[in-house]
């Protein structure tokens, strides 16, 4: 069983008994409708969290035709899928199996490891997944399917196959109907015209909702959907058994006669989260929320109005201002949403008007968002990603004993991690190394609060540089002609920004390593 599967199994057991969210699998998603943003774009994205990670992440382009019509794809854990046409080209953030072993399933068979998010050549965007967990009661009626689709396959299959968001929704829900799901999840599927969010909490149930332009919601591993009228067929796609499974489990909350279900209450229960409280404080511009003084059901998504009528989707979260892309970035940087357990973060910014080639911007970041700068890419124009995103490196070595050589750190649970010699050659590796140095120190040497403040300030300044670079990139792309010139302008600009983040991070890491070692040497002389 892989690390992710083990963590997920432990999470389910914990959630069933204690109804708390451990940090090891603690992703957080955000959606802000276009009516609520400064420039009228829709913004949505997610942080992938994995506690203390020991393997590399990549960001690359999956070429068109990587999978061929009729090819049977075998995923990590037994799920198979037959491609209906040659696969589309798409951007992808993914786990690194470049040295032959998949870090998800520990397998060497040829397959694409977990891909978290991306955009295909048709302009379809997928973010998968926000891990969700049904209660033991509903899972006893409709359990997860061992060889059903799992998060490691969702992005790969949907971006390879779907030409519109609705096609993606139809494909994913048909897979849930037939093959089933290996786990619960929340998935964004979008195109230039619409954004859908799909939640499943058992093996074969699901609810897909077309999101409105006037809603904002966040999701820290809890079902985001509350009271939903399933008769709103223009905006809702639901499994035929959604109500009946909850009824059989004895957990149904809603009005079956009116075809209304409270999904969160029926399938997920009320789970306290310090990330939800922190996110609400950020969105409201206050510090009054704690995980003990709110109910996440108060902020769940609904399409049912006060009089029971179907209304545009809302969440009861009220922003204090129109959001900019920097506001969305700062949301992900808010602790404990941002933390050393972050693995990668992606934020899609989508304009409903204009040329599709520039209507979608992917903002990408790796590792700890507290100390980070996000880089923009035009996925429809990008022909390649920066070389530092594509470097395969060895895994970090874990141990219960203090290492006697190499560069290592000890995490909060007392476990030791030693970096391979090539770790900082990759974009993810150097970002991870700096984050762990700022959080845990290195080789027993600690950093100071002043060091952490300086790192935050450096990344804040770097983000402002990137925002200026992004403005220059937009102007250069607009002026370029023909299409090949636009592609070159976009690709070169984004890759230069990525290289700038890498170079800055490596310099900060090496400087801070030397500083902590010097402090330790001086301290040893004094004592």
Regions found by a protein language model. Give the residues of each.
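Charged low-complexity "KEKE/polyampholyte" interaction tracts
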Residues: 369-370, 379-527
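A contiguous strand-loop segment
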Residues: 27-150, 171-296
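Sec/Tat signal peptide C-region and signal peptidase I cleavage site
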Residues: 6, 21-26
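Long, well-ordered mid-to-C-terminal structural blocks that present hydrophobic/aromatic surfaces
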Residues: 294, 299-401
């Amino acid at each position: 069983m892989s690390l992710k599967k083990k963590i997920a199994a432990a999470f389910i057991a914990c959630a069933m008994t204690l109804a708390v969210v451990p940090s090891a699998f603690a992703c957080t998603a955000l959606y802000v409708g276009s009516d609520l943003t400064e420039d009228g774009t829709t913004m949505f994205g997610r942080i992938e969290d994995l506690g203390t990670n020991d393997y590399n992440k990549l960001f690359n382009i999956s070429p068109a035709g990587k999978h061929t019509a009729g090819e049977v794809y075998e995923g990590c854990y037994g799920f198979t899928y037959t491609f209906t046409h040659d696969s589309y080209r798409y951007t992808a953030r993914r786990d690194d199996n470049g040295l032959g072993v998949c870090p998800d399933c520990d397998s060497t068979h040829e397959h694409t490891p977990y891909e978290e998010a991306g955009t295909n050549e048709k302009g379809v965007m997928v973010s998968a997944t926000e891990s969700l967990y049904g209660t033991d009661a509903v899972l006893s009626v409709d359990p997860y399917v061992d060889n059903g689709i799992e998060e490691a396959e969702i992005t790969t299959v949907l971006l390879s196959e779907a030409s519109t968001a609705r096609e993606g929704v139809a494909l994913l829900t048909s897979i849930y109907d037939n093959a089933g799901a290996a786990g619960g999840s929340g998935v964004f599927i979008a195109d230039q015209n619409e954004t859908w969010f799909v939640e499943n909490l058992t093996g074969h149930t699901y609810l897909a909702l077309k999101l409105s332009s006037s809603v904002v919601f966040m999701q820290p591993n809890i079902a985001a959907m509350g009271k939903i009228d399933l008769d709103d067929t223009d905006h809702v796609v639901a499994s035929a058994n959604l109500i009946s499974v909850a009824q059989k489990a004895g957990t149904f909350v809603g009005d079956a006669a009116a075809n209304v279900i409270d999904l969160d209450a029926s399938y997920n229960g009320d789970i306290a989260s310090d990330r939800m409280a922190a996110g609400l404080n950020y969105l409201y511009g206050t510090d009054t929320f704690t995980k003990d003084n709110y109910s996440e059901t108060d902020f769940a998504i609904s399409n049912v109005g006060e009089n029971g009528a179907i209304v545009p989707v809302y969440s009861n979260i009220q922003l204090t201002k129109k959001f900019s892309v920097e506001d969305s970035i700062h949301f992900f940087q808010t602790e404990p949403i941002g933390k050393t357990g972050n693995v990668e973060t992606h934020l899609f910014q989508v304009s409903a008007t204009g040329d599709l080639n520039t209507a979608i911007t992917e903002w990408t970041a790796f590792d700890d968002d507290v100390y980070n700068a996000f880089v923009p890419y035009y996925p429809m124009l990008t022909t390649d990603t920066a070389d530092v995103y594509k470097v395969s490196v060895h895994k970090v070595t874990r141990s219960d004993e203090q290492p006697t050589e190499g560069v290592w750190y000890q995490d909060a649970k007392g476990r030791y991690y030693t970096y391979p010699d090539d770790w900082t050659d990759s974009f993810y590796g150097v970002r991870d190394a700096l984050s762990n140095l700022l959080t845990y120190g290195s080789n027993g040497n600690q950093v100071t609060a002043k060091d952490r403040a300086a790192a935050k300030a450096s990344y804040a300044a770097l983000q402002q540089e990137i925002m200026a670079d992004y403005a220059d990139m937009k102007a250069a792309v607009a002026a370029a002609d023909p299409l090949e010139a636009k592609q070159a302008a976009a690709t070169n600009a984004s890759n230069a920004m990525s290289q700038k983040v890498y170079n800055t991070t490596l310099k900060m890491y090496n400087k801070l390593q030397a500083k902590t070692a010097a402090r330790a040497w001086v301290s040893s002389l004094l004592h």
